[in-house]
Amino acid sequence: MTDILKSIALYKRREIAQAKVRMPFETLERKAHDHDPPRGFVKAIEAKHAVNQLALIAEMKKASPSKGLIRADFDPPALARAYEEGGAACLSVLTDGPSFQGDLSFLEAARAATHLPCLRKDFLFDPYQVYEARANGADCVLIIMACVDDEEAGQLTRAAHDLAMDILVEVHDEAELTRALRLETRLVGVNNRDLRTFETSLELTERLAEKIPSDRIAVSESGIASHQDCLRLKAHGVSTFLVGESLMRQKDVAAATKDLLIGKLPPLHGKHAHGL
């Protein structure tokens, strides 16, 4: 585990302990099971693939440890609607406060504004957080293999299955991929960001994609900024992408989302430019 992940793990475990005092697990468990049923996260991605479209998990990220504030006018419902209008399959909502200025309330607000399924994007260590995610509207949770051992990953997986939630398991290298493939989860995400340097390289997805079995859905995360990037990865069999920062920096998020998925349309000339 890198130094930054160690520091994150320390404060997350403190947060979990404090949350358990505020709301005992039995209460949280009831709240999670009483929430309206999960929207199918994997199904939404498969629906895009079924009509030969790229599937985008569009992320709401207000800030990050490496880039600081990314979007000042951060309005989760408005952003969710813009992403849906632009053609996203699913939403990813940062709920970590100290590092990303996220909040659990963003999750429920985004989900209520659209029909799209939502991922709770956070650092999960304890099944309590999975129930917390479902109680706040999440349809899918993230398991970062760099953060947890195999026993913890298994506990998180079982909690998600208990709640009929989907799981995105995230890897950064081949060793983590080998561990991830032992879990019962359809979505395998390759994070192109080096957690030591914070630099991104799409070559990581290109290299690992061929090692992901065809019964899993490969997801490329981080460093994707254009339709050309998507096409480059599609050539390696990857048609699902998680994109946040490059879209969060755009004034017109809906238009930017559409451009990412289908490319910019060429300007009209001659009679077509005037509707003739």
From Swiss-Prot:
CDD domains: IGPS (cd00331). Its EC number is 4.1.1.48. GO terms for biological process: L-tryptophan biosynthetic process. One of its GO terms (molecular function) is indole-3-glycerol-phosphate synthase activity. InterPro entries: Aldolase_TIM (IPR013785), Indole-3-glycerol_P_synth (IPR045186), Indole-3-glycerol_P_synth_dom (IPR013798), Indole-3-GlycerolPSynthase_CS (IPR001468), RibuloseP-bd_barrel (IPR011060). Pathway: Amino-acid biosynthesis; L-tryptophan biosynthesis; L-tryptophan from chorismate: step 4/5. PROSITE patterns: IGPS. The keyword Flavoprotein does not apply. Keywords: Amino-acid biosynthesis, Aromatic amino acid biosynthesis, Decarboxylase, Lyase, Tryptophan biosynthesis. Pfam families: IGPS (PF00218). SUPFAM superfamilies: Ribulose-phoshate binding barrel. The keyword Lyase applies. It catalyses: 1-(2-carboxyphenylamino)-1-deoxy-D-ribulose 5-phosphate + H(+) = (1S,2R)-1-C-(indol-3-yl)glycerol 3-phosphate + CO2 + H2O. HAMAP family: IGPS_B. Belongs to the TrpC family. This is Indole-3-glycerol phosphate synthase. It comes from Methylocella silvestris (strain DSM 15510 / CIP 108128 / LMG 27833 / NCIMB 13906 / BL2). The gene is trpC.
